[in-house]
Amino acid sequence: MKPSIVAKLEALQERHEEVQALLGDAGTLADQERFRALSREYAQLSDVSRCFLEWRQVQEDMETARLMLSDPEMRDMAQDELLEAKAKSEALEQELQLLLLPKDPDDERNAFVEVRAGTGGDEAALFAGDLFRMYSRYAESRRWRVEIMSASEGEHGGYKEVIAKISGEGVYGRLKFESGGHRVQRVPATESQGRIHTSACTVAVMPELPEAELPDINPADLRIDTFRSSGAGGQHVNTTDSAIRITHLPTGIVVECQDERSQHKNKAKALAVLGARIHAAEVAKRQQAEASTRRNLLGSGDRSDRNRTYNFPQGRVTDHRINLTLYRLDEVMEGKLDALIEPIIQEHQADQLAALAEQE
């Protein structure tokens, strides 16, 4: 391992011990905000510290085995121990490299997930409903909370557009690579000839930002329209102008919210989604500039990117970004997404490692 990396790991190990001591200090315990921040830092450093201490022990074991090679009686055993230690050292070095990769500060945050029907009319709206159900099931399996922020239902079911906030541990980090185009190939229920139709939906995943980090939005840049809610809601529907449409004039971003009966609550939800969308647009612009010198295999998460095809007649789902095909479509649509999410995360890590190697 390079001396520069070892030096960095030693500094992190020292910081881990320092934070551990601070957490036991009475002054820290009295300041709950500082205690929480240090607890998070301690948890983040723990894996690196454990792995580095293990790696250091393996280096000592290798040195001991090398010294034993000069003893004829111990040579065979020493060679076996040296081979075993080398293999362990390589595995630990690989793990440490992954642990040292730059972390996306948004990964641990809640996320807004937006599913929008694209080409394909009613069938696209039905598929948008299926995708939203798939993400909701996945969220349930991870004990995340799903709250619909805004929904525009399709005429024959599903959604023209649905935005939900998903809250829990590491939501954005797991779902961020879902952003992009999703295509479905299947025979619609209304199709009497049994012909396969192709429809498309787009998904956008945006981190929920704390208020302090939301982009500054000038109220003069907003056009706020109120209108009467449509859809489910019984006697309260169409009696008050509780629904809100906010247009951010500089970017043209439009957010509607009509899920709550209170105009005030709808406005608060719409502003939260608007802030996340503006932030996501700024991040995408920055990433595009950074990636212009380097081809990113995973795409930009732009609506025009084609992420996956869900082929119902063949029971197949294909992720085009990493050429992965699974014949487990029923399971995937029931929310068993880890078999698709894990390989994408691994590909992203490999891409980061390659970028680091190029920098060095």
Swiss-Prot record:
Peptide chain release factor 1 directs the termination of translation in response to the peptide chain termination codons UAG and UAA. Residues 286-313 are annotated as: Disordered. GO terms for molecular function: translation release factor activity, codon specific. It comes from the Bacteria. InterPro entries: PCRF (IPR005139), Pep_chain_release_fac_I (IPR000352), Pep_chain_release_fac_I_sf (IPR045853), Prokaryotic/Mito_RF (IPR050057), RF-1 (IPR004373). It holds the Pfam family PCRF. This is Peptide chain release factor 1. Gene3D superfamilies: 3.30.160.20, 3.30.70.1660, 6.10.140.1950. Keywords: Cytoplasm, Methylation, Protein biosynthesis. It is found in: Cytoplasm. It comes from Cronobacter sakazakii (strain ATCC BAA-894) (Enterobacter sakazakii). The modification N5-methylglutamine is found at Q235. One of its GO terms (cellular component) is cytoplasm. Belongs to the prokaryotic/mitochondrial release factor family. Methylated by PrmC. Methylation increases the termination efficiency of RF1. PROSITE patterns: RF_PROK_I (PS00745). The keyword Protein biosynthesis applies. The keyword Protein biosynthesis applies. Its main location: cytoplasm. The lineage of its organism: Bacteria, Pseudomonadati, Pseudomonadota, Gammaproteobacteria, Enterobacterales.
